[in-house]
Every structure is written in structure tokens, then in C-alpha cells.
């Protein structure tokens, strides 16, 4: 399969974003998949246009977006995105939407059509912290996952799409002893394992849910 993997530019006054750092270190061939890479701005208003133009000019079987989730201690494939922008902080264009629908003609939520449980289990099988997430937040990460679902629904019915959040890397938590992080090479290994699992036509039937 031809897979586009995206990462984000740094945001919130940070100098690094582990999502893009990890994406740049992925091999160009993973299993039977050919990997293209794209850096996205952390911008509500710009990401849709960039994704739209990229999909209009290239054929991809899968788009997998990667984002930073500071405070998480595991690599977390996302199950679902919701139709809301509700930004706790401004994006890199100083835009801070609050309680705004992403697409007025879109569904309340879009579920990733990738085998998210198989991807999560593949990460865990590498001896790495992995967990299935049921919330991509309400910042630009959720926005991108929702927009991909919207595009699949309205324009690209055969497109497979998903999102994975990754933790901070150690240099981001200097002076923050209680904040979890993960070495970049482990994030790269986890993403590689997840991408390999995309080959699964059907997801695994595993109890990876949560009680809260």
C-alpha cells in the first residue's frame, strides 16, 4: 500500500514536536508499504487545504497522521474524532476556536477505519507502551483526524485513515520530573510496528477498552 504519514510542526512555544521527528526517521519502505512523509502546520485554518491539495495530486491508500500528546506515557492509536474544535490554547496562527463545528455537513464523529486494535497490539508486542485511545482531544490533532474521516465520507470512499498520538521525548521534559516521556527511537519503533499492522484487513477482537 501507498501510505502518507504526517507529523506536526512544534507548537505552544516548544522547539520540537516528536511526531514529526519520529516521522522523519521512518523507513521509506515498511513491510509491503511505501511511505511518503508530510509535515503539517499546527494550524486549524491551514491543515485542511494542505491535506486536500496533497490528496488531489497523489493517490494514497492510507493516510496516517501522527501527533504529540504531552502527558501520555504510551503510543496511542486513536479510535475516533469528534466534530468540534475547542482549543485550550491558540494554534500557531494565534487562532483559538471555541465550540466550533469542523464541518457543518459532517457527521458528529468519524471512526478510523484502520485496524486500530491490531495496531495497538503490534506496538505492545514490541515490548513498548501502547494503548488504544478513545479521545483525540479537541485541538488540531482531532481536527485532522476528523477532516480525514470527512474526506473519506464525502470524496474518497476507498481511503483508509487514522491517527496515532505519541508522548513527549526526554528533552521536552527537562525540569519536569513528573511528566512522562519516551525515547525517540522507541517512538519510531512503535510507529513502525503500527504501520506494519495496517496490512490486516480485519481488526483484532480484543478487550482494549477503558472503564472511564
UniProtKB/Swiss-Prot annotation:
Gene3D superfamilies, per database record: Peptidase C15, pyroglutamyl peptidase I-like
Coarse class of the protein's main subcellular location: cytoplasm
- Can you cite a GO biological process for this protein? proteolysis
Which superkingdom heads the taxonomic lineage of this protein's source? Bacteria
Any one Pfam family here would be Peptidase_C15
EC class name: hydrolase
Instruction: Point out the signal peptide segment.
Output: none
Listed A to Z, the keywords are: Cytoplasm, Hydrolase, Protease, Thiol protease
Residue numbers annotated as active site: 78, 141, 165
Where are the annotated coiled coils located? none
Reaction it catalyzes: Release of an N-terminal pyroglutamyl group from a polypeptide, the second amino acid generally not being Pro
What EC identifiers does the entry list? 3.4.19.3
Listed SUPFAM superfamilies: Pyrrolidone carboxyl peptidase (pyroglutamate aminopeptidase)
Record field: transmembrane: none
**What would you give as a GO molecular function for this chain, any one?**
pyroglutamyl-peptidase activity
**How is the subunit organization of this protein annotated in UniProt?**
Homotetramer.
Its annotated function is as follows:
Removes 5-oxoproline from various penultimate amino acid residues except L-proline.
What does the sequence similarity comment in the record state about its family?
Answer: Belongs to the peptidase C15 family.
Which HAMAP family does the UniProt record give? Pyrrolid_peptidase
PANTHER family given in the database record: PROTEASE FAMILY C15 PYROGLUTAMYL-PEPTIDASE I-RELATED, PYROGLUTAMYL-PEPTIDASE I
* Name under which the protein is recorded: Pyrrolidone-carboxylate peptidase
Q: Which organism is it from?
A: Staphylococcus aureus (strain MRSA252)
Amino acid at each position: 500500500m501507498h501510505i502518507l504519514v504526517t507529523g506536526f510542526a512544534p507548537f505552544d512555544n516548544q522547539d520540537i514536536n516528536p511526531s514529526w521527528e519520529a516521522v522523519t526517521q521512518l523507513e521509506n519502505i515498511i513491510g509491503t508499504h511505501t511511505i511518503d512523509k508530510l509535515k503539517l502546520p499546527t494550524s486549524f485554518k491551514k491543515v485542511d487545504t494542505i491535506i486536500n491539495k496533497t490528496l488531489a495530486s497523489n493517490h494514497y491508500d492510507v493516510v496516517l497522521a501522527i501527533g504529540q500528546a504531552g502527558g501520555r506515557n504510551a503510543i496511542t492509536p486513536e479510535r475516533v474524532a469528534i466534530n468540534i474544535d475547542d482549543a485550550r490554547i491558540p494554534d500557531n496562527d494565534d487562532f483559538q476556536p471555541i465550540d466550533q463545528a469542523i464541518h457543518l455537513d459532517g457527521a458528529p464523529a468519524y471512526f478510523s477505519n484502520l485496524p486500530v486494535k491490531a495496531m495497538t497490539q503490534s506496538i505492545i508486542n514490541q515490548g513498548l507502551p501502547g494503548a488504544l485511545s478513545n479521545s483525540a482531544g479537541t485541538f488540531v490533532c482531532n481536527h485532522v483526524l476528523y477532516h480525514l474521516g470527512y474526506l473519506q465520507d464525502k470524496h474518497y470512499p476507498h481511503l483508509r485513515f487514522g491517527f496515532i498520538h505519541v508522548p513527549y521525548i526526554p528533552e521536552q521534559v527537562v525540569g519536569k520530573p513528573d511528566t512522562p516521556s519516551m525515547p525517540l527511537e522507541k517512538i519510531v519503533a512503535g510507529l513502525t510496528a503500527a504501520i506494519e499492522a495496517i496490512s490486516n484487513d480485519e481488526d483484532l477482537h480484543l478487550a482494549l477498552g477503558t472503564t472511564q
